[in-house]
Amino acid sequence: MAGERERGGGHRGGREERDSEFVDKLVHINRVAKVVKGGKRFGFAALVVIGDQKGRVGFGHGKAREVPEAIRKATESAKRNLTRVALREGRTLHHDIAGRHGAGRVYLRAAPAGTGIIAGGPMRAVFETLGIQDVVAKSVGSSNPYNMIRATFDALKHQDSPRSVSARRNIKVSTLQSRRVGGDAEAVAE
């Protein structure tokens, strides 16, 4: 059994091979304490963002007595909570959006090529794992990493691609693209 793990055979080897497409970023580790009769029992909570850099991203939270175990649990939770986000030209957002969770608000703006990721802290990890290369983001209110991540995911959830907007409004994608500021009527919607 131990020999199989070292060689990469068996069930675990196949799972690791499949998961190699994902990039994960550790956003935050927090040491937590539980007060018991004999004193304090310490543990760790980890927040991880995972994505394939092609439009799929997820976040997870894990708690354990040791840091590596908390990170592993958070990574598994993130893999179960993957969502797909439509990207314009595979590098930025389709339009400006805002998201909110608790007292935290985030504002995300699409940016021209070459701008880079202008975002702070936890939001940067989301954009890097998502595959966004050009975005301007601002966080207002709570700077708690958990709330910032959830507010960012709330914003990304409300983004619409031109194809979904045109289907909802019963117009052609090319008509919608030509109305975009600086848009090209021949542009292909993703």
From Swiss-Prot:
Superkingdom, natural source: Bacteria
Family annotation (Pfam families): Ribosomal_S5, Ribosomal_S5_C
Keywords, in A-Z order: Ribonucleoprotein, Ribosomal protein, RNA-binding, rRNA-binding
GO biological process, one term: translation
Residues in S5 DRBM domain copies: 22-85
Annotated S-S bridges: none
InterPro entries: Ribosomal_Su5_D2-typ_SF, Ribosomal_uS5, Ribosomal_uS5_bac-type, Ribosomal_uS5_C, Ribosomal_uS5_N, Ribosomal_uS5_N_CS, Ribsml_uS5_D2-typ_fold_subgr
MF terms in GO: rRNA binding; structural constituent of ribosome
UniProt GO cellular component terms: small ribosomal subunit
This protein's domain notes: The N-terminal domain interacts with the head of the 30S subunit; the C-terminal domain interacts with the body and contacts protein S4. The interaction surface between S4 and S5 is involved in control of translational fidelity.
Oligomer and partners: Part of the 30S ribosomal subunit. Contacts proteins S4 and S8.
Function, as annotated: With S4 and S12 plays an important role in translational accuracy. Located at the back of the 30S subunit body where it stabilizes the conformation of the head with respect to the body.
Family: Belongs to the universal ribosomal protein uS5 family.
Protein known as: Small ribosomal subunit protein uS5
Species this chain originates from: Nitrobacter hamburgensis (strain DSM 10229 / NCIMB 13809 / X14)
